[in-house]
UniProtKB/Swiss-Prot annotation:
The keyword RNA-binding applies. Regulates transcriptional attenuation of the pyrimidine nucleotide (pyr) operon by binding in a uridine-dependent manner to specific sites on pyr mRNA. This disrupts an antiterminator hairpin in the RNA and favors formation of a downstream transcription terminator, leading to a reduced expression of downstream genes. This is Bifunctional protein PyrR. A motif (PRPP-binding) lies at residues 93-105. Belongs to the purine/pyrimidine phosphoribosyltransferase family. PyrR subfamily. Homodimer and homohexamer; in equilibrium. Keywords: Glycosyltransferase, RNA-binding, Transcription, Transcription regulation, Transcription termination, Transferase. Its EC number is 2.4.2.9. Pfam families: Pribosyltran (PF00156). It catalyses: UMP + diphosphate = 5-phospho-alpha-D-ribose 1-diphosphate + uracil. GO terms for molecular function: RNA binding; uracil phosphoribosyltransferase activity. The gene is pyrR. It comes from Streptococcus sanguinis (strain SK36). It comes from the Bacteria. InterPro entries: PRibTrfase_dom, PRTase-like, PyrR, PyrR_bifunctional.
Amino acid sequence: MKTKEVVDDITMNRAITRITYEIIERNKDLNQVVLAGIKTRGVHLAHRIQKRLAQLENIDIPVAEVDTKPFRDDIKVEEDTTVIPVDITDRQVILIDDVLYTGRTIRAAIDNLVSHGRPSRVGLAVLVDRGHRELPIRADYVGKNIPTSQTEEIIVEMTETDGQDRVLIMGE
């Protein structure tokens, strides 16, 4: 298996900053926004975006932690470890994940969100969009488009869990 680094720490930070600026531009009332990170790396990304929003706009946006496992169609887990610190009804929720691939994780995350309230709108921000969708799901905010083959794998490493920031592509 060959492994190649396709995004380094500087490029990753720039992508997160770009996503943050796009969130500011597209959301007129940031007080209505809730960032919802999909466990695990999506939560880290959400906190980084939250921190940048605080620096740029002097606003404290709430961050939810969304567990997709109880809502997936391929595995069954009963315990839902989702943490949503505010009522999301009539709020603009931006789901955040590290990689968008088939769309199935996002579908499960949306199912989880609507079990907790009725957002006025749900957006999607991803660090990497690798293509190969199985469901009609599209990201509103994309850090990097990295086309892959079905046999390749994208691995996102983040300082919080892996000790460094980078994106790797693994293939034959």
